Amino acid sequence: MARALWTLPTTLIGHLAGLVVSGGGPRRVGGPAARAWLYVIRPGLGLDWVGAVTLGHAILARPGLLDGDDLHARLTLAHELAHTRQHDWLGPLYLPLHVLAQLASAALSIGGRPVVSRVHDDNPLEQTFICIAASATRAPYPAGLASDAERRRFLARFGA
Protein backbone atom coordinates (compact mmCIF):
# COMPACT_ATOMS: atom_id res chain seq x y z
CA MET A 1 0.00 0.00 0.00
CA ALA A 2 2.77 2.44 0.93
CA ARG A 3 4.60 1.69 -2.34
CA ALA A 4 1.42 2.38 -4.34
CA LEU A 5 1.00 5.76 -2.63
CA TRP A 6 4.70 6.59 -3.08
CA THR A 7 4.48 5.99 -6.85
CA LEU A 8 0.93 7.33 -7.28
CA PRO A 9 1.75 10.83 -8.60
CA THR A 10 3.99 9.54 -11.40
CA THR A 11 1.74 6.56 -12.12
CA LEU A 12 -1.28 8.87 -12.54
CA ILE A 13 0.72 10.99 -15.00
CA GLY A 14 1.63 7.78 -16.83
CA HIS A 15 -1.96 6.57 -17.03
CA LEU A 16 -3.20 9.96 -18.22
CA ALA A 17 -0.50 10.18 -20.89
CA GLY A 18 -1.12 6.53 -21.83
CA LEU A 19 -4.83 7.07 -22.35
CA VAL A 20 -4.15 10.14 -24.49
CA VAL A 21 -1.54 8.51 -26.75
CA SER A 22 -3.10 5.06 -26.99
CA GLY A 23 -6.74 5.96 -27.35
CA GLY A 24 -7.67 2.86 -25.42
CA GLY A 25 -7.07 0.72 -22.42
CA PRO A 26 -3.80 -0.79 -21.28
CA ARG A 27 -2.83 -4.41 -20.80
CA ARG A 28 -1.03 -5.83 -17.77
CA VAL A 29 2.60 -6.90 -18.27
CA GLY A 30 5.32 -8.20 -16.01
CA GLY A 31 6.14 -10.96 -13.61
CA PRO A 32 7.22 -11.54 -10.01
CA ALA A 33 9.87 -8.78 -9.98
CA ALA A 34 7.77 -5.98 -11.48
CA ARG A 35 4.35 -5.32 -12.97
CA ALA A 36 3.02 -2.45 -15.07
CA TRP A 37 0.28 -1.36 -17.43
CA LEU A 38 1.33 -1.17 -21.10
CA TYR A 39 -0.16 1.47 -23.41
CA VAL A 40 0.62 1.17 -27.13
CA ILE A 41 1.12 4.55 -28.80
CA ARG A 42 -1.21 5.10 -31.77
CA PRO A 43 0.55 5.70 -35.09
CA GLY A 44 0.13 9.14 -36.63
CA LEU A 45 0.68 11.19 -33.47
CA GLY A 46 4.19 12.30 -34.46
CA LEU A 47 5.69 10.17 -31.69
CA ASP A 48 7.56 7.76 -33.96
CA TRP A 49 10.81 8.80 -32.26
CA VAL A 50 9.61 7.35 -28.93
CA GLY A 51 10.67 3.79 -28.22
CA ALA A 52 9.28 3.27 -24.74
CA VAL A 53 8.78 5.49 -21.70
CA THR A 54 7.95 4.36 -18.18
CA LEU A 55 6.03 6.70 -15.89
CA GLY A 56 5.39 5.09 -12.53
CA HIS A 57 3.71 1.79 -13.26
CA ALA A 58 2.60 2.77 -16.77
CA ILE A 59 4.70 2.00 -19.85
CA LEU A 60 4.04 3.83 -23.12
CA ALA A 61 5.60 2.11 -26.14
CA ARG A 62 5.51 2.32 -29.90
CA PRO A 63 3.56 -0.47 -31.63
CA GLY A 64 5.37 -3.80 -31.78
CA LEU A 65 8.40 -2.72 -29.75
CA LEU A 66 7.59 -4.83 -26.69
CA ASP A 67 5.63 -7.55 -28.45
CA GLY A 68 7.00 -10.78 -29.74
CA ASP A 69 9.33 -13.41 -28.46
CA ASP A 70 12.61 -12.11 -29.87
CA LEU A 71 15.35 -11.35 -27.36
CA HIS A 72 15.49 -7.60 -27.99
CA ALA A 73 11.74 -7.13 -27.43
CA ARG A 74 11.86 -9.19 -24.24
CA LEU A 75 14.92 -7.36 -22.89
CA THR A 76 13.43 -3.97 -23.74
CA LEU A 77 10.25 -4.89 -21.86
CA ALA A 78 12.33 -6.07 -18.90
CA HIS A 79 14.34 -2.82 -19.07
CA GLU A 80 11.14 -0.77 -18.88
CA LEU A 81 9.80 -2.95 -16.07
CA ALA A 82 13.05 -2.33 -14.20
CA HIS A 83 12.23 1.38 -14.36
CA THR A 84 9.03 0.61 -12.43
CA ARG A 85 11.26 -0.71 -9.63
CA GLN A 86 13.22 2.54 -9.74
CA HIS A 87 9.90 4.38 -9.35
CA ASP A 88 9.18 2.16 -6.32
CA TRP A 89 12.43 3.30 -4.70
CA LEU A 90 12.37 6.98 -5.72
CA GLY A 91 8.63 7.70 -5.94
CA PRO A 92 7.86 11.29 -6.94
CA LEU A 93 11.60 12.07 -6.98
CA TYR A 94 12.11 9.77 -10.00
CA LEU A 95 11.00 12.18 -12.76
CA PRO A 96 13.04 15.21 -11.66
CA LEU A 97 16.08 13.03 -10.92
CA HIS A 98 15.79 11.27 -14.28
CA VAL A 99 15.47 14.56 -16.19
CA LEU A 100 18.53 15.98 -14.37
CA ALA A 101 20.49 12.78 -15.04
CA GLN A 102 19.51 12.86 -18.73
CA LEU A 103 20.61 16.49 -19.08
CA ALA A 104 23.88 15.90 -17.23
CA SER A 105 24.53 12.77 -19.29
CA ALA A 106 24.00 14.65 -22.55
CA ALA A 107 26.15 17.60 -21.39
CA LEU A 108 29.02 15.37 -20.29
CA SER A 109 29.15 13.31 -23.44
CA ILE A 110 28.52 15.77 -26.27
CA GLY A 111 30.29 14.82 -29.48
CA GLY A 112 31.04 11.55 -31.17
CA ARG A 113 27.80 9.71 -30.37
CA PRO A 114 24.20 10.07 -31.52
CA VAL A 115 21.94 12.11 -29.22
CA VAL A 116 19.88 9.08 -28.15
CA SER A 117 23.05 7.26 -27.15
CA ARG A 118 24.33 10.28 -25.19
CA VAL A 119 21.25 10.67 -23.05
CA HIS A 120 21.09 6.99 -22.19
CA ASP A 121 24.64 5.70 -21.92
CA ASP A 122 25.89 8.00 -19.17
CA ASN A 123 22.65 8.30 -17.21
CA PRO A 124 22.96 6.22 -14.03
CA LEU A 125 19.20 5.47 -14.10
CA GLU A 126 19.67 3.88 -17.54
CA GLN A 127 22.82 1.93 -16.76
CA THR A 128 22.74 -1.82 -17.25
CA PHE A 129 23.85 -2.51 -13.68
CA ILE A 130 20.89 -0.57 -12.29
CA CYS A 131 18.21 -1.47 -14.85
CA ILE A 132 19.61 -4.99 -15.15
CA ALA A 133 18.71 -5.04 -18.83
CA ALA A 134 19.76 -3.94 -22.26
CA SER A 135 20.37 -0.46 -23.47
CA ALA A 136 17.76 0.62 -25.95
CA THR A 137 20.53 1.93 -28.20
CA ARG A 138 22.94 -1.02 -28.15
CA ALA A 139 22.73 -4.73 -28.70
CA PRO A 140 21.34 -6.46 -25.62
CA TYR A 141 23.81 -8.05 -23.27
CA PRO A 142 27.27 -7.40 -24.71
CA ALA A 143 29.49 -10.48 -24.90
CA GLY A 144 30.46 -11.78 -21.49
CA LEU A 145 27.91 -9.70 -19.56
CA ALA A 146 25.54 -12.60 -18.90
CA SER A 147 25.22 -16.27 -19.75
CA ASP A 148 22.16 -17.65 -21.53
CA ALA A 149 20.97 -19.15 -18.22
CA GLU A 150 21.29 -15.76 -16.48
CA ARG A 151 19.34 -14.10 -19.29
CA ARG A 152 16.54 -16.65 -19.00
CA ARG A 153 16.34 -16.22 -15.20
CA PHE A 154 16.30 -12.44 -15.56
CA LEU A 155 13.56 -12.50 -18.20
CA ALA A 156 11.48 -14.95 -16.14
CA ARG A 157 11.67 -12.70 -13.05
CA PHE A 158 10.37 -9.76 -15.06
CA GLY A 159 7.76 -11.82 -16.89
CA ALA A 160 9.23 -10.89 -20.25
Regions found by a protein language model. Give the residues of each.
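Metalloprotease/metallohydrolase-associated module, dominated by Zn2+-dependent proteases
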Residues: 1-26, 37-43, 47-48, 54, ...
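Ser/Thr-centric signal marking residues that sit
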Residues: 11, 76, 84
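Extended acidic/polar regulatory tracts at the flanks of large eukaryotic scaffold/adaptor proteins
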Residues: 32-34
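Short pre-active-site segment immediately N-terminal to the catalytic Zn-binding motif
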Residues: 46-52, 59-77, 120
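Catalytic Zn2+-binding segment of zinc metalloproteases
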Residues: 81-99
